[in-house]
Every structure is written in C-alpha cells, then in structure tokens.
C-alpha cells in the first residue's frame, strides 16, 4: 500500500562511504528510496564530469538497474582549481594540515566545493549529470575531522564539520546537486 511519504523512485547509490550515504539518504528520502551498493570502480583520470559519467556507465552495467554515483572536488582558486577531482588522494596523502600548507604562500584562501552526481536508469541509458557548487574558503581544521575535508572548508563563518548535519544538508555542494536531481525526478519521472 502506498502512503503519502512512500518513495516513488529507487536508486542504488554506489558508495562505500557511510557518511556520504547518510547525507544522501537524509536529503533524498522519503521521496527517493536510496539503496546502497559498494563497487570497486576504477576511476579514470579526467574532468569531474568525465570521471562521474564513466563511473555511472560502468556501475549501471554491473548493477543492471538504476544507479546514482557521485564525485566530489575541492578546488582552490589560488591553485587554478587543484586539487579538484583528485582531492581524495590529496587528503589521504597530506591530511588537513598539508592541504592548508598548499595555500601557505597565497593570500587567496577561497575555494569551491563541487559535487557531481550522475544518474542512469540502467545499462544502455545515458547518465544525466547534476552538479552543485558551494563557495567558501580553506581554514585551519575546526570541528570533528572524521569526514574528509569538512573540517577545513568554511562556509559563512563555520566549517562543514562545525555545522549541525541538518544545517549542512541545506547548504552543501552535495545538497545543491541532489536538489537538482530531485527536481529532475519530479518532472521526468512523474506518474
């Protein structure tokens, strides 16, 4: 039996990151049911869009159903967009302090958090991209350091890590991209 809050659509979010999964579910559900699968997908090198589209196509083929994949960038304006789509590896190698040190010689600490989701209805369906951007700046780590670079990305006086999760989920780059996905589902997938 369908209830007013029952999900009308279902996607398999391809991630092994429980923090990302929690955020995506908090933003999309109950309108879109979010299941999770962990696939070891090799990421090509390229632009954020190329990486996300490639991951989505391969995930749709493996899952044989509707998939949602995500790729995130942290772009330092002083470094012409670096680390960009390679933030995961920069973060693993350098940590919060090392990322701050990359900007030590620059007055400009501004940055963009960019999130790109790709949705595919399944094998053979061309993925659709949804991108969200939040402008902020890089600061010394503040708040819990347990979710990537959240502790060094400041938006309007608070780092993502200092924010209440519900507040972050209303302004983040991930939220902005998922809002576009929700809008698309509402228009394109309406009964």
From Swiss-Prot:
UniProt catalytic activity: ITP + H2O = IMP + diphosphate + H(+); dITP + H2O = dIMP + diphosphate + H(+); XTP + H2O = XMP + diphosphate + H(+)
One term of GO molecular function = ITP diphosphatase activity
Question: Where is this gene product found?
Answer: Cytoplasm; Nucleus
How does the cofactor attach, per the note? Binds 1 divalent metal cation per subunit; can use either Mg(2+) or Mn(2+).
Catalytic class of the enzyme = hydrolase
Q: Which InterPro entries match?
A: ITPase, ITPase-like_fam, RdgB/HAM1
For this UniProt record, the keywords arranged alphabetically read as follows: Cytoplasm, Hydrolase, Magnesium, Manganese, Metal-binding, Nucleotide metabolism, Nucleotide-binding, Nucleus
Per UniProt, what is one Pfam family of this protein? Ham1p_like
* Required co-factors: Mg(2+); Mn(2+)
- Residues involved in ITP binding: 15-20, 55, 71-72, 88, 147-150, 168, 173-174
Could you say which protein family the record assigns here? Belongs to the HAM1 NTPase family.
Q: What's its job?
A: Pyrophosphatase that hydrolyzes non-canonical purine nucleotides such as inosine triphosphate (ITP), deoxyinosine triphosphate (dITP) or xanthosine 5'-triphosphate (XTP) to their respective monophosphate derivatives. The enzyme does not distinguish between the deoxy- and ribose forms. Probably excludes non-canonical purines from RNA and DNA precursor pools, thus preventing their incorporation into RNA and DNA and avoiding chromosomal lesions.
- How would you summarize the oligomeric state and partners of this protein? Homodimer.
Protein name per its UniProtKB record: Inosine triphosphate pyrophosphatase
- What is the protein's species of origin? Chaetomium globosum (strain ATCC 6205 / CBS 148.51 / DSM 1962 / NBRC 6347 / NRRL 1970)
